[in-house]
Amino acid sequence: MAAALTFRRLLALPRAARGFGVRVSLSGEKITHTGQVSDGKDYRGIRFVDRQKEVNENFAIDLIAQQPVNEVDRRIIACDGGGGALGHPKVYINLDKETKTGTCAYCGLQFKQQHH
C-alpha cells in the first residue's frame, strides 16, 4: 500500500520533477534505465568508438505513468497483461475498499472499483 501511495504522489509532481527519463553521467554518457554507466577504462567501451551509445529513452516507468486508472464495476479484477504470448501470468487484484487503487505487480496497470 505504501508503494502505491508513493507512486501516486510521484505522479502528482510535474513531469520534469519526477526524475524519470534519460540521465547523463559526468562524462556525458547516457545512463541506461537500470542506472548502468561504464567506466572510461572499461574494455567493453570499444564497441562505441566513433559512435554514441544508443539508449532507449522510453523508460517503462514513464509509459506506465501515462496510463489512466482503469475503472471497473467488479470487486475482483484479473490482469494478464494483455493476454497471449506478450502478457504475463494472470493475477487477481482485490478492490474491496472504496478508496483503494489496485496495481498489478507485473505490468503496473492500475484499477479502481467504480461504485454505484
From Swiss-Prot:
<keyword id="KW-0809">Transit peptide</keyword>
<dbReference type="GO" id="GO:0005743">
    <property type="term" value="C:mitochondrial inner membrane"/>
</dbReference>
<comment type="function">
    <text>Accessory subunit of the mitochondrial membrane respiratory chain NADH dehydrogenase (Complex I), that is believed not to be involved in catalysis. Complex I functions in the transfer of electrons from NADH to the respiratory chain. The immediate electron acceptor for the enzyme is believed to be ubiquinone.</text>
</comment>
<protein>
    <recommendedName>
        <fullName>NADH dehydrogenase [ubiquinone] iron-sulfur protein 6, mitochondrial</fullName>
    </recommendedName>
</protein>
<dbReference type="GO" id="GO:0006120">
    <property type="term" value="P:mitochondrial electron transport, NADH to ubiquinone"/>
</dbReference>
<dbReference type="InterPro" id="IPR019401">
    <property type="entry name" value="Znf_CHCC"/>
</dbReference>
<keyword id="KW-0249">Electron transport</keyword>
<feature type="transit peptide" description="Mitochondrion">
    <location>
        <begin position="1"/>
        <end position="20"/>
    </location>
</feature>
<keyword id="KW-0496">Mitochondrion</keyword>
<keyword id="KW-0472">Membrane</keyword>
<keyword id="KW-0007">Acetylation</keyword>
<dbReference type="GO" id="GO:0045271">
    <property type="term" value="C:respiratory chain complex I"/>
</dbReference>
<keyword id="KW-0679">Respiratory chain</keyword>
<dbReference type="InterPro" id="IPR016668">
    <property type="entry name" value="NDUFS6"/>
</dbReference>
<dbReference type="Pfam" id="PF10276">
    <property type="entry name" value="zf-CHCC"/>
</dbReference>
<comment type="subunit">
    <text>Mammalian complex I is composed of 45 different subunits. This is a component of the iron-sulfur (IP) fragment of the enzyme.</text>
</comment>
<keyword id="KW-0999">Mitochondrion inner membrane</keyword>
<comment type="similarity">
    <text>Belongs to the complex I NDUFS6 subunit family.</text>
</comment>
<feature type="modified residue" description="N6-acetyllysine">
    <location>
        <position position="90"/>
    </location>
</feature>
<keyword id="KW-0813">Transport</keyword>
